[in-house]
Design a protein with these regions (language model features):
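Generic beta-strand structural signal
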Residues: 15, 23, 31-33, 57-59, ...
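Beta-propeller domains
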Residues: 23-43
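Loop/turn residues immediately N-terminal
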Residues: 26-29, 69-74, 117-120, 159-163, ...
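Conserved beta-propeller blade signature
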Residues: 19-22, 63-66, 110-113, 153-156, ...
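Short coil-to-beta transitions that initiate beta-strands within beta-rich domains
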Residues: 1-16, 42-61, 86-107, 131-151, ...
């Protein structure tokens, strides 16, 4: 069989030293920037036909992790092309509409998975899930759009403020360990160079000010 998939509408991207990984609705492609070689991966190769919502490539483990709107995660071992379907999020006793995978962030061998209910740990070496963080008020579900690591803290952009906690805190499952830095609805938090930036639901870019522990300098997209 030969597959014909649209790669025009890119939903998520990730990169390694010399390769760019991109996801469309139900397929992946990668481009080696040194050789210009392009590789495609789709349902014929083993991907799910569900809608992709996030992608991340781990340079350390040479694995590409694909997240879906229904909570499915597929881990691709780039060394041999083998795929592992991980259904732990799908199996959680949560409403189906909260299981969407929004983003992956890696630290110390752990992928922190942002979902519409909170954050989940996934060990990239053992391929096993760890703790789940419900960081909403009083430990409620909260939509986490993206996380970023900055100055020893994990920052979570949510639909109810930007919240942070020490990445080395052993008790992050306790919502009391998370502090709200700013309220409002946020869609992104990311580092660029030596700075931390966040984008709110209105499309304004804010830069984090370490001295005042706040986000300032709004820029309209």
């Amino acid at each position: 069989w030969q597959g014909y998939f649209s790669y025009n509408e890119i939903k998520a991207v990730s990169e390694s030293t010399n390769t760019l990984f991109a996801a469309s609705e139900n397929a992946l492609f990668s481009k080696n920037t040194a050789t210009n070689e392009i590789k495609t991966t789709n349902t014929i190769d083993g991907l799910s036909g569900q809608t992709i919502s996030a992608v991340y490539h781990s340079v350390k483990f040479n694995k590409t992790v694909v997240g879906y709107e229904n909570g499915l995660i597929i881990v691709i071992n780039e060394a041999d092309g083998k795929m592992l379907n991980v259904v732990d999020i799908i199996s959680k006793q949560l409403p189906a509409e909260l299981k969407r995978v929004n983003h992956f962030m890696e630290f110390d061998g752990i992928a922190y998975i942002s979902c519409d209910f909170g954050i989940v740990q996934f060990n990239l070496a053992s391929m096993q899930f760890g703790d789940t963080y419900f960081i909403g008020d009083n430990g409620a579900e909260i939509k986490v759009k993206q996380t970023a690591l900055f100055n020893g803290f994990i920052y979570a952009a949510t639909n109810s403020g930007i919240r942070r906690a020490s990445i080395t805190n052993k008790n992050l499952i306790d919502y009391n360990q998370w502090t709200t830095i700013v309220g409002g609805s946020w869609v992104s938090a990311t580092t660029f160079g030596t700075d931390l930036y966040a984008i709110n639901a209105l499309g304004n870019i804010h830069k984090y000010n370490v001295g005042s522990n706040s986000f300032v300098n709004s820029i309209q997209l």
